[in-house]
Amino acid sequence: MKQLHLEPIACIDGEINIPGSKSISNRALLLATLAKGTTTLTNLLDSDDIRYMLASLEQLGVQFELSDDKTRCTVQGMGGAVSASTAQTLFLGNAGTAMRPLCAALTLGQGEFTLTGEPRMEERPIGDLVDALRQLGASVTYLKNDGFPPLTINATGLNGGDVDIAGDLSSQFLTALLMVAPLAKGKVNINIKGELVSKPYIDITLALMAQFGVDVQNHDYARFEINPGQQYLSPGKVLVEGDASSASYFLAAGAIAGGSVKVTGVGRLSIQGDVKFADALEKMGADIEWGDDFIIARSAKLSGIDMDMNHIPDAAMTIATAALFAEGETCLRNIYNWRIKETDRLHAMATELRKVGAVVEEGHDFIRITPPVKMNTAAIDTYNDHRMAMCFSLLAFADCGITINDPDCTSKTFPSYFAEFARLTQEA
């Protein structure tokens, strides 16, 4: 197994333009496919999740041109549903942002589609989405375990109707349903059961759908109405914002050991909820400066916080490791959906924090962290989870350094992460 040892680092300083958002990249690729007209996406993320989506679209006959650096993609829209005359099997790795939306989108046309992935994908639930699609007339069959991939879709189009979907597990289910609803044969009313997690991710979906000319009536996130007869129309160009979750590691580094760190590509005008990570850092005591398309973090004395993190579950992981550099206890609440991500992140985070000496209480949907008086060095397991690797890179600011096992797992969202981290710390 490959390991990366990070020697103790005293300071970080500089500026970084954050690669495109994974969430926006894959949503925009799918909407551009369903749209009428040609769409050029710029600042597209080049990472594993996006490559799985592009490979699947290519296999389905979607025509696109990708620049040499893979960050600019021009998509010839299909002007509606994707169909296939022969049975298709699509391999989607561990890319939830490809699996969930494609599962929904492929019910719209005609044909037989089988969706498979890595072993971890077979442990990531999709049952709530499939149940909702079945309520609208879709034929979906599980190939192994009920409620989980792999699965086969026998597509004949989606009817309209009323559909109930649980809101408390993953916002990706609702995102997938929202994106296909305008192309159903009749009006779709989506009713949310329970509290909706990760609302800001739904805002991203609604903003992009509006950019492609589709209207959704949002009744306070409890009910969504989507009228039939709508068509996605290419806006011509779509700029993919920098990934706000990826920005969180550099902002936290600035708060712990700046200097000052300026991230560009996200800011006050961002459609991503994860920019609110900077507010959480500010609550801890960090010096934060906002611009329309940048955020600057400077170091200050940090204190522990007790906070509901339901609105920023991905970026909240970064607070868990930043908490090691704060005075007092930190408690992150309402984060159950960490458990169904790339790995069970609640268990993984608790396990690895204990290795460096933290006292950790792992609850059903919360984590409570008391930093150690003196941190231990350790070899951190990353569980094939990009965010675990990036979060624990912050322990390079401890005076003992840190070792990251399987550092290349960052290829899921940020292949050049450790190179950029080294660049800013070297400049310091």
Swiss-Prot record:
On whether Transcription is a keyword of this UniProt record, the answer is: no
GO term, biological process aspect, one: chorismate biosynthetic process
- Cellular compartments per GO CC: cytoplasm
Q: Where is the active site?
A: D314
Q: Tell me where it resides.
A: Cytoplasm
Q: Which UniProt keywords apply?
A: Amino-acid biosynthesis, Aromatic amino acid biosynthesis, Cytoplasm, Transferase
Q: Main site of residence?
A: cytoplasm
User: What pathway is this protein said to act in by its record?
Assistant: Metabolic intermediate biosynthesis; chorismate biosynthesis; chorismate from D-erythrose 4-phosphate and phosphoenolpyruvate: step 6/7
Q: Per UniProt, where does phosphoenolpyruvate bind? A: K22, G96, R124, Q172, R345, R387, K412
> Which Gene Ontology molecular function entries are recorded, alphabetically?
3-phosphoshikimate 1-carboxyvinyltransferase activity
E.C. number: 2.5.1.19
Q: Pfam families per the record? A: EPSP_synthase
Which of this chain's residues are annotated to bind 3-phosphoshikimate?
Answer: K22, S23, R27, S170, S171, Q172, S198, D314, N337, K341
According to its UniProt record, which reaction does this protein catalyse? 3-phosphoshikimate + phosphoenolpyruvate = 5-O-(1-carboxyvinyl)-3-phosphoshikimate + phosphate
What residue ranges carry the coiled-coil annotation? none
Q: Provide the function of this protein.
A: Catalyzes the transfer of the enolpyruvyl moiety of phosphoenolpyruvate (PEP) to the 5-hydroxyl of shikimate-3-phosphate (S3P) to produce enolpyruvyl shikimate-3-phosphate and inorganic phosphate.
Q: Which NCBIfam families match?
A: aroA
What the record says about family reads: Belongs to the EPSP synthase family.
Task: Tell me how this protein assembles.
Answer: Monomer.
* Identification of the protein by name: 3-phosphoshikimate 1-carboxyvinyltransferase
Q: Give the originating organism.
A: Shewanella denitrificans (strain OS217 / ATCC BAA-1090 / DSM 15013)
